[in-house]
Amino acid sequence: GLFKTLIKGAGKMLGHVAKEFLGSQGEPES
């Protein structure tokens, strides 16, 4: 439903922000 879509969108956005933030800190070793 709509709620699931919102959660998915929020997670995607957070993932992008986290990636950008970590990218500015330097690539994490994995």
UniProtKB/Swiss-Prot annotation:
Keywords: Amphibian defense peptide, Antimicrobial, Secreted. It is found in: Secreted. One of its GO terms (cellular component) is extracellular region. It comes from Phyllomedusa trinitatis (Trinidad leaf frog). Belongs to the frog skin active peptide (FSAP) family. Dermaseptin subfamily. Expressed by the skin glands. Has antimicrobial activity. It comes from the Eukaryota. GO terms for biological process: defense response. The lineage of its organism: Eukaryota, Metazoa, Chordata, Craniata, Vertebrata. Disulfide bonds: none annotated. This is Dermaseptin-3.3TR. The keyword Secreted applies. The keyword Secreted applies.
